[in-house]
């Protein structure tokens, strides 16, 4: 069985144990059900010597199954130099060689499952720590990400990882608190969510899942364990990943397609599976809206802007090689009526291309579409005239970045190209209400930004303030 990677239409189960005895009666059927359910890749995770061997065999047999090798903390007491050398040999021999590898051979994508488990204490804690450190050093030597198991061992896990030099990997089946998640992400680690997020009593995990920034989110089954609702109590399997994905989508207020795209991209990037998108998208869908990415240029250099940190928003590559023509934008849109809104909002300031915005907006309106512009409010400063009358009748709503309660704060965080930018934004907001039916302003939760003062400023201007959470884009 082979699987083509089409971001947004498949899922990757980043952690399961297909080699375990629980799958002996029907392993072939389990793998087929996963394939049929849209699972584009499966990573089967090693935990002991036999499990590592079984995972490697599966990865050689199936094009879309990958493996990791490592030794679980439960079994750390049995770890020997001979076992370490065997793991190192496997990792070296079968290490995935390049991001686009689709051939049999290089199928080891990580070191794991490794870590600490202070809940069961099946192995003495000092031995767990020593074995953990040794495998982290192996991962660093080979340049492979690590798959970390941490249960009731927050302090030691974070201290050991922080001191190891390893800065890529995943905290699998996350069960810690928000502080642990934030500290793990600060090092560079992803947070993986499994079946327990579907449980009614998993309130803490659900809150954390809703708050994880897109770039750090992964999903998994941990099959045969931790079966999600509505199959809780049965043996878990990769095909059930869809139920975890649905719960995650609902918690984050996005579509299932969005979660597929976000988590698949993150898994591909972390584990070097498949081919990453190489070209920036002109039109990209999030939930029921279509967003238009028509320029990467901007008259602000906001410290919080995602374009300085990543090429991706909700799994969409927005780094343009060239600015699109009107015809290219129309082709990318297709039928405007199929979307709730079409929003001019990319990695730059759309009103820098005012003529294109006007022409495309008029084209959308003629085809029963709704138009919104997300702007920094510099339009009148850019053109040294009031451009808002030109948008009347072709723009249904506009969202303007207020971003600060005063000029000093605005200049500090937004670094505008214009000397009197803040005053220009306030004037733009006042004028917008004369020509566009729906006007709102936004501000991001940043140190130094007084949200209540921003709300007061918005009230004086006669518009509603929408507060945006830092790192929550799209």
Describe these PLM feature segments:
Residues 1, 277-308:
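N-terminal pre-triad scaffold of radical SAM enzymes
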Residues 1-271, 289, 304-311, 317-331:
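Mid-domain alpha/beta scaffold segments of enzyme catalytic cores
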Residues 90-94, 106-109, 163-171, 177, ...:
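Structural recognition of alpha->loop->beta junctions
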Residues 115-119, 224, 312, 350-351, ...:
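Conserved radical SAM core fold
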Residues 143-145, 166-169, 365-377, 436-441:
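Short beta-strand/loop segments at the ligand-binding rim of alpha/beta enzyme cores
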Residues 158-171, 271-278, 357-364, 450-467:
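Short, electropositive alpha-helical surface patch
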Residues 315-330, 350-393, 404-405, 445-453:
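Canonical radical SAM enzyme core domain
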Residues 325-337, 342, 421-474:
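Auxiliary Fe-S-binding modules of radical SAM enzymes
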